[in-house]
């Protein structure tokens, strides 16, 4: 894991130098958030045992790459992917492997969200003590029970219930 994490760290810390790349936007090191196929990369830290790094990067991306104005997205919203990353990451998870039906935990960005599902069910996501200073997940519960997995399944979400992040 350590060699992988070192390579991943270098992606976010080594600056892009040389030729000007006019269509590359949203750079953090060499990670280009404006290039949608790389959106899952920040969540690889969580899978490799460093969820706090995923949580830091998600907060940094929210703070630097999205603005509430007409040109508030870096890159462009090809097929809605920039918006999809924003919405899923705001809920605190993201599908690193979209065909697995599993979402990797990051850190929520809103204090409360409710998804209205089929058959009148809801899935509520609560981030207790969320602030810019409290951007790290301390613990998670699903329907009142401690939840320690790195991922949540699509099946668990569509059953309905309540996911609570305790932030620190």
Please identify what each model-predicted range represents.
Residues 129-168:
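C-terminal beta-sandwich/jelly-roll accessory domains of carbohydrate-active enzymes
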């Amino acid at each position: 894991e350590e060699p992988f994490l070192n390579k991943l760290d270098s992606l976010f810390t080594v600056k892009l130098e040389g030729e000007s790349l006019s269509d590359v936007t949203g750079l953090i090191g060499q990670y280009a958030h404006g290039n949608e196929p790389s959106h899952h990369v920040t969540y690889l830290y969580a899978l490799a045992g460093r969820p706090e790094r995923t949580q830091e990067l998600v907060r940094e991306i929210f703070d630097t790459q999205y603005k509430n104005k007409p040109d508030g997205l870096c890159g462009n919203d090809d097929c809605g992917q920039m918006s999809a990353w924003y919405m899923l990451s705001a809920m605190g998870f993201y599908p690193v492997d979209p065909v697995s039906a599993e979402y990797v935990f990051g850190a929520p960005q809103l204090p409360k969200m409710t998804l209205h599902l089929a058959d009148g069910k809801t899935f509520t996501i609560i981030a207790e003590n969320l602030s810019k200073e409290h951007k790290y997940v301390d613990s998670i519960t699903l329907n009142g029970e401690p939840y320690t997995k790195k991922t949540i399944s699509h099946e668990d979400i569509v059953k309905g219930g309540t996911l609570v992040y305790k932030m620190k």
